[in-house]
A protein has these predicted regions:
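Charge-dense, helix-prone N-terminal extensions
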Residues: 1-126
Length: 126
């Protein structure tokens, strides 16, 4: 899957169980949540400017490894830098890797939900 534009990002995130979208901060920052917790944030104006990026949750050790390995991955902008990375598109992160990082973020957040909420989400029809 290639995420070339905001529509494809939207469809990729929405294809996961229990995902909802929100604008909790301002009308520019699109936030995807699972079970009421954020796993992906992006700025709509940055997409329009051609400089899109995502804020994604990441395992703290892996986050450090990724930042060392990729120029386009930095500590999370306006987020806990231990648990979040900012990943820029059009850099040295492949589309496949971008999808893996979104999946990793979703899984981390999903696993942090209560068993009851996890079960409710798994029972949803997608």
């Amino acid at each position: 899957l290639l995420i070339m534009d905001i529509q494809q990002l939207y469809e990729f995130c929405q294809s996961k169980k229990g995902v909802t979208e929100h604008f909790p901060f301002d009308e520019d920052t699109l936030v995807f949540k699972v079970g009421g917790k954020m796993f992906c944030l992006t700025s709509l104006s940055e997409w329009e400017k051609g400089t899109p990026s995502l804020n994604l949750k990441c395992d703290p050790e892996r986050a450090l490894e990724l930042r060392a390995e990729y120029e386009a991955i930095e500590p999370g902008y306006h987020m806990s830098k231990v648990h979040w990375n900012t990943v820029r598109f059009h850099g040295d992160v492949s589309d496949k890797m971008m999808c893996e990082l979104i999946n990793h973020s979703y899984e981390l957040v999903f696993k942090s939900l209560t068993k009851k909420v996890q079960q409710e989400i798994q029972e949803l029809e997608n």
